[in-house]
UniProtKB/Swiss-Prot annotation:
Protein name: Phenylalanine--tRNA ligase beta subunit
Main location: cytoplasm
Localization of this protein: Cytoplasm
Cofactor or coenzyme needed: Mg(2+)
CC cofactor note: Binds 2 magnesium ions per tetramer.
Record-annotated FDX-ACB domain positions: 734-827
Listed EC numbers: 6.1.1.20
Length: 828
């Protein structure tokens, strides 16, 4: 939020006329009471002759690729200045700001007389951006008639001695997105009297301004309307108002629109102006209907959803509530009668709609943070009086003031009871008696003391004050957090990492050492990802948990698998030229269960009971820890040693074994079919008899639909399904020599090599130290649908030197066990 210091000082000075602090001091004060000051911008500096001029004559130059104008400008001298200008948003008679030769504009831009486009240009007509007043380069700055006379000091007229505070307002402090809120904060910080600019004299009320109906459950808390008729369509906003809007980052357009923006900045209440003569029948507030569309003020037709809240008349949509007006009731250049609207919308509804439609606005930002419903009519009256004063016309005494629930006294949140010394006890600081009551009264709360207890009714603009802790925070920040001692809490002796944490770190290190790069995956699923994978409707991964207020409207579902985020990252990397990619992620997924219940509300002013904690646990979906990896491109790089090798399913299987070794468990792989993997190159991973995940090459159809490189491989394991091994056994080292033997076994072609290896290991017993498959052979001499697997066996005893007969006996036992388990025959 951009705030001109001169305007802020004026609002504060209404209650403290002598208040005047330097901008640098005010910056530190705002930071001290909890506000984030992103930047303090000093306007200018402009050195040299900057003056107000009046355009007396314009000659359009032709023969150039863009419009060029040769202007005569009266700058108060005896002779008009000749200036070449490329802007077209002004006419003869307009007041402009002229930088004469010798002027240096912000950014070090020096102005000199020069010949350009075949004419002599004796200065420059300036835009707001060139003067450092904003970012608008669309045309030169045209001053309203009567602002100044030609030859007047341009720097003084523009107020270039001002300072702009750029603040980052946190979501819980929406009241500070206004001069009213910030001035109150400053008054609290300096113990000044505060005069509320929202305390305006009410305008007369006689009858209803406009028929209005509001559909239930739309979340509207208040809706006020007042007409202003007979305004002059040729009127323009005065310079003082345009300047304040410009310095606040808003471009002036017309008086009706300008005054709504001005009151929004001043009081924090967004407003909207409708052309009264373009409204057909009564107004209504309702949800959008399926398939309904609206053309907004930017002339774009937008598709609406049934959750969008609209303002409608009998013929068309008049506005998207809290987001943007519709073209049907837009105030235009010939409008003479306007209907001013001040409404309070549901913050969640506004946030959801503006995100989905990509329509962020100053009004929507304020509605998202909460708007004070108590000042709707005051803001409406302030706006109407300003408009009538600027553009003429008559403010109607008719007023529509619809109030929803709750409409309690003052529109305030519920009262809160708090021990008067609670801030002292929580901060460890002894504050003077009455400090809590004083500070809470300063922020606008109604405070009643009864012994040692304060009953506090928060003000209507502070919906964030809900419990004693919130009140304590207000007292502490206004008293200054710097007075709280910096004492480190005494921590209990550390117990180190848990077994699960140690395992997680070991897995991450092992994958990194194997060439994988870790990513931090987003917890939300991309829209339609499971349709791209071709998952059936009853696949458990489709059973997702939906977030009510997602960061992105098109990603409201929490991830049940890590692969979508990894594959998105892989596509992004490949699109940027990184074709050999190996990524992994370690994170939780969210898997709803049939037993998941609604979350029970538990107060935060006490520790939950064991029963309440059990209910909370039961209401949560499963959140197991998963590890997943994806890889594509070359797994072994090309070089003098060879052409390199592309990643394949075997690399995904090896990554599974890397994870298993880090976790201290043995895994088995068996052929399986599971989307999005290729049915012939997918393995189910088992620990004991428990399935823990899948690995292999992705299905070609999925690869094509998802825009992935050909041959992309992936794996995903559920770490929570893998038992924890508290202490990994140390490797057994034998000082005795090993005996090496090979064995070739013939099995059916559809028997997995892993099944044969498992049988060999089981049959060979403890003497078998290592087994490696090093050859697979098929041929007519083996018979149809048969294959030969050759293993290298390494035998070693821990307590003696093995003989060849010992190793042969163990090998023969392994062959017998393989024959029993998978029908293997010894190849001779």
């Amino acid at each position: 939020m951009r705030v001109p210091y001169s305007w802020l000082r004026e609002v504060v000075a209404a209650g403290a006329p002598d208040w005047d602090v330097a901008p640098a001091e005010l910056e530190q004060t705002l930071i001290r009471i909890g506000h984030e000051v992103e930047e303090v911008i000093e306007l200018g500096p402009v050195d040299g002759p900057l003056t107000v001029g009046r355009v007396t004559d314009i000659e359009e130059l032709t023969g150039f690729k863009k419009p060029i104008r040769f202007c005569h400008v009266d700058v108060g001298d005896d002779v008009d200045r000749e200036i070449v200008c490329g802007a077209t948003n002004f006419v003869a008679g307009d007041l402009v700001v002229v930088a004469l030769p010798g002027t240096t504009l912000p950014g070090g831009f020096a102005i000199a007389a020069r010949k350009t486009y075949g004419r002599n240009s004796d200065g420059m007509i300036c835009s707001a951006a060139e003067l450092g007043l904003g970012a608008d380069h669309s045309g030169i700055l045209v001053l309203p008639p009567g602002t100044a006379e030609p030859g007047a000091d341009g720097a003084a007229v523009l107020g270039l001695d001002d300072v702009i505070f750029h603040l980052a307002i946190t979501p819980d402090r929406g009241y500070c997105m206004s001069l009213r809120g910030l001035a109150r904060e400053i008054a609290c910080a300096y113990d000044l009297e505060f005069v509320d600019p929202a305390d305006v004299k009410p305008l007369p009320v006689d009858g209803q301004a406009w028929p209005l109906t509001v559909q239930p459950d739309t979340g509207v808390r208040r809706f006020a309307l007042r007409p202003v008729t007979g305004i002059d369509p040729a009127a323009v906003s005065p310079w003082w108002l345009q300047r304040r809007l410009l310095l606040s980052g808003i471009r002036a357009t017309s008086p009706a629109v300008d005054v709504t923006n001005y009151v929004m900045l001043e009081l924090g209440h967004p407003m909207h102006a409708h052309d009264r003569n373009r409204i057909s029948g009564g107004l209504g507030v309702r949800f959008a209907r399926p398939g309904e569309t609206v053309v907004t003020l930017d002339d774009i037709e937008r598709k609406l959803e049934p959750v969008d809240v609209l303002i409608v008349d009998d013929a068309a949509t008049a506005a998207i509530g809290g987001v943007m007006g519709a073209a049907s009731t837009e105030v235009r250049a010939d409008s003479t009668d306007v209907l001013l609207e001040a409404a309070v919308w549901d913050p969640a509804a506004v946030s959801r709609t503006q995100r989905r439609l990509h329509l962020p606005s100053e009004a929507a930002r304020r509605y998202e943070r909460g708007v004070d419903p108590a000042i709707s009519v005051a803001a409406l009256d302030r706006c109407a009086a300003l408009l009538a004063g600027i553009a003429g016309g008559k403010v109607s005494e008719a007023l529509t003031d619809w109030r929803g629930e709750p409409a309690c006294d003052g529109w305030s949140p519920p009262a809160i009871q708090m021990p008067a010394d609670l801030p002292d006890r929580l901060a460890g600081v002894i504050y003077p008696p009455g400090t809590a009551a004083k500070r809470l009264a300063q922020i606008g709360a109604a405070v009643t003391a009864d012994g040692g207890t304060l009953t506090v009714v928060p003000p209507s603009w502070r919906p964030d004050l809900l419990q004693p802790a919130d009140l304590v925070e207000e007292v502490l920040r206004l008293e200054g957090l710097e007075v709280i001692g910096s004492v480190l809490p005494s921590a209990p002796a550390g117990r180190g990492l848990s077994a699960a944490q140690r395992r997680r770190r070991a897995i991450g290190r092992s994958l990194a050492q194997s060439g994988y790069v870790e990513i931090l995956p987003t917890p939300f699923l991309p829209a339609g990802v499971f349709d791209v994978w071709g998952l059936p409707d009853d696949d458990p991964r489709r059973g997702t948990t939906q977030v009510l207020n997602p960061l992105e409207a098109d990603r409201p579902h929490l991830a049940t698998t890590l692969l979508p985020a990894l594959l998105e990252a892989l596509v992004r990397n490949v699109s940027r030229g990184l074709v050999d990619v190996s990524l992994y992620a370690l994170a939780q997924v969210v898997q709803p269960t049939a037993e998941t219940r609604a979350v029970q509300f538990i107060p935060v002013d006490r520790r939950p009971t064991d029963a309440e904690i059990a209910v909370l646990d039961a209401s949560l979906p499963r959140q197991p820890q998963h590890v997943a990896a994806v890889l594509t491109g070359l797994r072994e790089q090309r070089g003098p040693w060879g052409p390199g090798r592309r990643a394949e399913a075997a690399d995904a299987f090896e990554a599974v074994r890397v994870i298993a070794r880090a976790a201290g468990v043995d895994v088995r792989l068996r052929a399986a079919q599971q989307l999005p993997w290729h049915p012939g190159r997918c393995a189910e991973v088992l620990v004991g008899d428990t399935p823990v995940g899948y690995a292999g090459q992705l299905h070609p159809a999925v690869v094509e639909r998802a825009g992935l490189p050909r041959g992309t491989c992936a794996l995903e394991l559920d770490l929570d399904a893998i038992p924890l091994v508290a202490t990994l056994p140390a490797p057994r080292i034998s000082p005795f020599p090993a005996v090496f033997q090979d064995v070739s076994l013939v099995v059916a072609a559809d028997v997995p090599a892993q099944a044969v290896a498992d049988a060999v290991c089981e049959g060979a017993g403890d003497l078998l130290e290592d087994l490696q498959l090093f050859d697979v052979f098929t041929g007519p001499q083996l018979g149809e649908h048969r294959k030969s697997l050759t293993f290298a066996l390494r035998f070693r005893a821990p307590d003696r030197t093995l003989t060849e007969d010992d190793a042969t006996a163990a090998r023969d036992a392994a062959v017998r066990r393989a024959a029993e388990a998978v029908g293997a025959e010894l190849r001779t």
